[in-house]
C-alpha cells in the first residue's frame, strides 16, 4: 500500500514533543504507560505519536510484517507515522598513501519516517499473538514464575514463613517471599520485586532526586503500571502529582526517565511472554503427539480387524471340514 508522505523526521519530532506535553499537562501519564506496555520495544516518542493517531491501538506492525503473518491492510486505511531508525549509505572520499583519491560508501545509523498499521486496520489469517492474562499465567504458572526469578539476575529467591509478602536484602542479593501465597499473589509479588531489581540496576536518567525526591519510586510504579496493564493484572495506585507539577522543560527531561521505564518493561515482558509462549508451544506439541499416537492406534486396529475376521472365517471352514470327515 503506497501512501504519499509529507511528514518529515523534524515535523514528527516536533509533533511528538507537543503531544507529549499536552498529555502530561492533562495528567495522562498513565495513558502513555499503557501504550508503552503494549509496545515496549518502541520509543516514548513513538508511543506518543501512535497514541495521538490511534488512541485505542492494540498491536502495530509494518506492512511487510502483516503480509508475513498472512494479513493485509484493509482498503482506505491510513498508516500510523513513526520515527524509525534506519541505515543510510554515505559516500566519503579517502586518500591512499600515494595521494590517490577514491570514494567509499559507508553506512550510518539515521532516522526516517516509518509507517505501521494497527491490527484493527488489517484482515486475513487469524493472528494468534500471545494475549497474556490471569488465566494464561495461572495455566503456565511454573514457566511464569521461573522467568521472573531468572530476570532478576544476581538475586536468588527464598520462600520462607514471614508476615510481609516480600523482603529484599540488597546487600546479600536475596529476595524473601512469603510461603503459601496464592498464584495471583505470588505472581504479583514476583513482578514487583523483579521490577525493583531492574529499576535499581539502571543508571539514573533524566529527572533526579534533587528535583523530585521520590523519583525512584515513581519510576518503579510507572514500570509496574506498564507491565501489569499489558498482562491484565491489578494496576498499582500511585501519586504522580510531583510529575504533573513539573515545568514543561522538566517534563521533557522526564522523557529520559520514561525511557528507563520502557527499558525495564521491555526486558521483563519479553522474558515473561517468551517463557509462556514456549510453554504453550510445548503443550501444543505434546497434544499433537498424543493425537498422532491415538490416530496411529486407530489405524492399526482398522488393519487388524479384517485380518482377524478372515482368520476366524478360515478356522470355521476348517472345523466344518473336520466334522465332515469324522461323519
Summary of predicted features, one role per range:
Residues 1-304, 320-327:
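N-terminal accessory/interface modules of nucleic-acid-binding and processing proteins
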Residues 306-320:
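Arg/Lys-rich low-complexity patches in intrinsically disordered regions that function as generic
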Amino acid at each position: 500500500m503506497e501512501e504519499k508522505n509529507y511528514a518529515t523526521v523534524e515535523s514528527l519530532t516536533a509533533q511528538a514533543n507537543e503531544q507529549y506535553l499536552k498529555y502530561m499537562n492533562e495528567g495522562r501519564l498513565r495513558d502513555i504507560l499503557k501504550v508503552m506496555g503494549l509496545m515496549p520495544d518502541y520509543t516514548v516518542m513513538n508511543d506518543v505519536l501512535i497514541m495521538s493517531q490511534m488512541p485505542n491501538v492494540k498491536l502495530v506492525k509494518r506492512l511487510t510484517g502483516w503480509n508475513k503473518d498472512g494479513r493485509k491492510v484493509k482498503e482506505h486505511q491510513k498508516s500510523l507515522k513513526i520515527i524509525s531508525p534506519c541505515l543510510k549509505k554515505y559516500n566519503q572520499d579517502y586518500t591512499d598513501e600515494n595521494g590517490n583519491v577514491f570514494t567509499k560508501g559507508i553506512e550510518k545509523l539515521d532516522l526516517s519516517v516509518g509507517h505501521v498499521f494497527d491490527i484493527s486496520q488489517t484482515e486475513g489469517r487469524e493472528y494468534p499473538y500471545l494475549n497474556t492474562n490471569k488465566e494464561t499465567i495461572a495455566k503456565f504458572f511454573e514457566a511464569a514464575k521461573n522467568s521472573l526469578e531468572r530476570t532478576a539476575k544476581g538475586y536468588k529467591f527464598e520462600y520462607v514463613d514471614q508476615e510481609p509478602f516480600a523482603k529484599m536484602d540488597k546487600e546479600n542479593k536475596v529476595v524473601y517471599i512469603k510461603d503459601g501465597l496464592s498464584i495471583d499473589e505470588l505472581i504479583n509479588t514476583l513482578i514487583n520485586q523483579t521490577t525493583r531489581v531492574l529499576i535499581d540496576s539502571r543508571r539514573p536518567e533524566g529527572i533526579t532526586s534533587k528535583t523530585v525526591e521520590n523519583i525512584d519510586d515513581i519510576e518503579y510504579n510507572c514500570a509496574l503500571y506498564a507491565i501489569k496493564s499489558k498482562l491484565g493484572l491489578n494496576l498499582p495506585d500511585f501519586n504522580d502529582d510531583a510529575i504533573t507539577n513539573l515545568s514543561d522543560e522538566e517534563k521533557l527531561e522526564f522523557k529520559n526517565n520514561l525511557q528507563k521505564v520502557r527499558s525495564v518493561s521491555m526486558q521483563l515482558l519479553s522474558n515473561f511472554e517468551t517463557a509462556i509462549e514456549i510453554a504453550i508451544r510445548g503443550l501444543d506439541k505434546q497434544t499433537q503427539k498424543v493425537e498422532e499416537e491415538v490416530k496411529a492406534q486407530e489405524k492399526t486396529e482398522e488393519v487388524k480387524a479384517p485380518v482377524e475376521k478372515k482368520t476366524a472365517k478360515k478356522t470355521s471352514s476348517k472345523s466344518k471340514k473336520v466334522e465332515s470327515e469324522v461323519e
